[in-house]
Amino acid sequence: ATYKVNAYQAARIVSSRSRLSIPDKVQSIRLQYNPLGNGGRYFIARFLYVEKRDISEHTYIELQGLGFHPLQINAFTRLRRLSIGVNIISGPTGSGKSTTLKNMLELLYEEKKKKVNIISIEDPPEYEIEGTAQLPVTNVETEEERGAEYRKAIIAALRSDPDIIMPGEARDAEVISLVFTAAMTGHQVWTSLHANSALAIFDRLKDQGVDDFKLTDPDLLTGLIAQRLVKKLCPDCSLSLSEYEAINGMIGDIDRKLIEGHEATVRFPNLNGCPECFHGYTGRTIVAEVIEPDYKFLDLVSQGKRQEATKYWLTQLNGMTMTEHAWIKMVEGSICVHDATVKVSHIDKISSERKAFLIETINRTV
């Protein structure tokens, strides 16, 4: 009813409320319509699928299935056990942030024996989240109205006696202020924003005017997470290096350098595919980094000592960068070197010492 030929428009189709014929496994479809200068149309449809899961399964299996490393899964477990604090998941659009948030809330609901009040504020709700009261943003026509209604919904949630609150996106300074207010008044908070790394979350918060005393308190700023999605190789038909080169020719010198010493374990896509995959791939997997900051880490970051803070995180807080996580998956053969380098940078900068540590983490979990 509101379709306009030459306007930029977004829409959402929900299977339970639509008269259209939508496949059973599709929960909703997010649409973006853009007019082109030549009179054409540029249309994007993002399908959100129903997630089949047994929440009685062990937490480790749930998050491992998404692609998180055991070190990161343990970190998430510790974060969920905290009674208060802000936990922020960052990444670009389409990096799986909503799926991770959904899993966190459902795991919290299960771990708290379903005796917990969890409220989310989403614009719009992308998935049904078991055990969560999901507040949508409604009755808006302009972006200004949308922002005001979103903030109003967060305030309403805070007045509804929540234990855990999840604003889907910390989209502006006012929302971020409400997020920290929620934590300071005794709530565990999960949210997301757009940042290129876990450390860059700190910069985004500072740019939005968050006070220094909040940014240097690890009891308040408890979790900094960044993630990407990388195409996952089909385990049934992926190719060894020699098989791939026999079909496609020699890989480049840069890629050969990146896999040096692990030629026997790396894998490549079979672009012809098999009955179990789509052109050599079976979905996507997460590469991530999770920081549980302490006073020293936040103090170093606040002083602008980024290299020292990163070194401290990696060596003293048992950290792992997103690039290192991608390297592990590449060495294990679950993602291809080509796909890894598209999603993360500086794989060639991982030191021999760090590689030895990462190999040790693989051996501990085999």
Across the structure, where does each feature detected by a protein language model lie?
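Conserved nucleotide-binding/hydrolysis micro-motifs of P-loop NTPases
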Residues: 19, 34-38, 50-52, 86, ...
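Conserved, well-folded catalytic cores of nucleic-acid-processing
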Residues: 1-2, 32-36, 50, 66-69, ...
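Cys/His-rich Zn2+-binding cysteine-cluster or related metal-binding knuckle/ribbon modules and their
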Residues: 196-293
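Helical mechanochemical/support elements of P-loop NTPase systems and associated helical scaffolds
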Residues: 5, 9, 25-27, 37-41, ...
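Hydrophobic alpha-helical scaffolding
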Residues: 66, 90-94, 169, 191, ...
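N-terminal "pre-motor" subdomain/linker immediately upstream of P-loop NTPase catalytic cores
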Residues: 1-94, 99-100, 326-366
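Switch/coupling sub-region of P-loop NTPases
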Residues: 77-80, 87, 104-231
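NTP-binding/hydrolysis catalytic cores, primarily Walker-type P-loop NTPases
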Residues: 64-78, 251-366
